[in-house]
Amino acid sequence: MTDIILEIKKFISESWTNIFMEVCNAVVYIDHCAIECLHWYTAGKSYLTLKDAGAAAVYEIGMYHFQYVEVKDVKKAVIISTSSDPTFYQRTIKMILTKNIFQNCIVYCSVPCCTVNHLGSSIEEKLNYNKLKKDIKIWMTSRNLSQEPVVNIIYAPIFIAFLNKNLFVTPPFGDLMPPLDTNILKDMVIKLNFLAYSFYNLFDNIKARLDIYSVGKFSDHLAENLEDYISNINHQNHLSESPKVGISLILIDRTLDLCTPTSNNTESFLTKILRTFPRLPNHDNDVAINISPMFGKTVSKPYIKKKLLGIANQFLNDIALTTDNSKLRTPSRISGHSLEKFLNKIQSTNNIASLAIHMEKLQCILAIIEASTSQKASQLELLTSLEKLALQNLSVSRESSSILVQLSNIICTRIHRGLDIDNLLALLIYIYALAGTQIQFSAQQEHQLEKSIANAIFEDLQILKKNPLINTKSAYQRTLLLLGVDDVIVAQETSCRIAARFINILRLVAEQRLILQDYRFCMLKPSSQEVIRHISILEQIIKDIFDVDVNRKLRDLHKKSSSFIQASFNLFLRGKTKRHPRDNSYILIYIVGGVTAEEAKIIQEIVSVQEKHSNKKTPYVILAGSRLLNPLDIVEKIFF
């Protein structure tokens, strides 16, 4: 049987290999999303890989990056972009070429030429390779070249970053989030069409037959676009080659379940790390770990999972054995404190050069220590306890729940508690998403909540007015700063308007699962003896797919026919049982809007149990999403 993981990785590798062959003695300009894809492809060595391939220099490009320096004594430029906006290419490439004298220019585009990408928006809104090529030649010729410039524009489908063998993200589509209402903005339609073509090209390249399912209106739209590509292009090409392997592609709207990505109550330590550390600049799926604690002391307290403690302790022993041939004494109880002590001992007896070869292990150790001992760790513990309180309150009291009153009081005392409004907004999204339409909050409670939020916004406006220079600004803080409100009365009125808007958005969050029939509830109490818990829609869907005893139709999974010919065959197969997602060898679940580390962990556990107890061969499950999410990402996408 074809190994789909291997085939997808070959597909990714082919694009990068072709690019590496062209960068020798060239200046490379690469955008943020392509950098992130390359970062994961090269295991964090994107810059070094390009330099090793012979690149004379490497520069990042962005929509609003105008500081392109002049590069002397280099005659070739290689530009790598994942943008779907034609004006981006016109503006950015023109600025690069007006500052340099290049004889040769190669542009790698992740978006196909408009003559291929025929669906969706108008031809003017798509990238025309021929027009862009002519424009580039004009810009290059204006620099008084001694000979005719050489220009090539090449389609390079760069959009996948594998985080591990069972999980990948799509950085160029990291900003996609299904709208809470039914209005899909024009730029979203273009992006969705771009994603559909990218998926089509991938599955066509690896010769896969798709059974497409969608859950949610945004995913329905994506599924229709993808099916249109499969039907129209395959029909034009007369289906020259038969598919090798079947894949059940399940597309799910993130907004149907906003409880999971806003939850802090998680068993996944990766989630804790993602919540603790800042992201790498312009990355959505990786964090930056400060290595400086290796050369100074850190404050620690004992809190960490036993398994991770043991792994970290073993890492330190491995480093000690390879640097000074001495084994560290394993304490009776491994703690964050003992890890810190061992780390300081190794640091004091070794130089930087000897430690540098263990950089990856040291980063992991520092991540474990920092994620469990930082100031954020205690804040996350408090948020987790509030989340548990909300879950219990909603499950027991339901309509008579006083959780909004309690949250209103917490918002008023947030500074004293060491909490910020961003995290409390995430908690409110969690509560409204969890309640859905089954639990209605009283108008009085919502009015009190709105008033508390308005007061908090006003207080934050005054704080930012006094101290505008904050190093790390959240989307919430940036929004308040951009308002530029100086007058107190205006600030109060503005705060009230923002608070009212927040409440309206929260009501929309609660209504997201109204379109579903089987997955409207995200609270589960298995038995009277067990504690109620939050259960994600993804977990419910994958369990239903694997449950062979469930005879009912999966009503919320909307099935799309996988090809033009299959639609014809269905006329002759009406008496045959409809295909089920588990009928294929592979199941690929893509969450439009992003996926969490906790969801990846849950899927892995469910599949592991299924493989252990099932008599039949279990489909291989791959989880994917627009990006890796944490609660504050949801706050930014939903409110701002």
Stretches found by the model and what they are:
Residues 1-640:
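Extended, well-folded catalytic/binding cores that form a central cleft or groove in large enzyme
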